[in-house]
């Protein structure tokens, strides 16, 4: 086989692998105050102090590509809607975080998780100024 033929076959294989990656599928949603190196949550919790950074890790099951978005809410009011375009070769975690330099108001919060614009899950958490 000539070098040109081998390179062409390698390119076709690579292109098929990328084109055949399916949509992302949710495995788990974690909320907490710290991350591991793989972007999963190392300190899972649903109770935060007003000055803490709040992390959410969206874990997907297998290779896939798409848009992962979160909708952070305080009560029913949407406070942020970040999104990330991702393309993973296998199971992975996509991280989002929220912080407020002036501190979060105490109360009930939630984060909705969307994959390609479709809500796939939600988590609730609370900010409490008396939490030690």
What is the predicted function of each stretch?
Residues 53-61:
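Short edge beta-strand/loop segments characteristic of extracellular beta-sandwich folds
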Residues 70-74, 113:
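Conserved aromatic beta-strand anchor motif in extracellular beta-sandwich/beta-rich domains
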Residues 1-20:
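Sec-dependent bacterial lipoprotein signal peptides
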Residues 79-89:
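Solvent-exposed serine/threonine-rich low-complexity stretches and specific carbohydrate-binding patches
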Residues 88-98:
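Aromatic sugar-binding surface patches on proteins
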Residues 101-103, 110-127:
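Short, exposed beta-strand-loop hairpins at the edges of beta-sheets
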Residues 65, 106-108:
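Extracellular Ig-like/FN3 beta-sandwich strand-entry sites
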Residues 20-50, 131-132:
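Short, compositionally biased P/S/T/A/G/V-rich stretches that sit at domain boundaries
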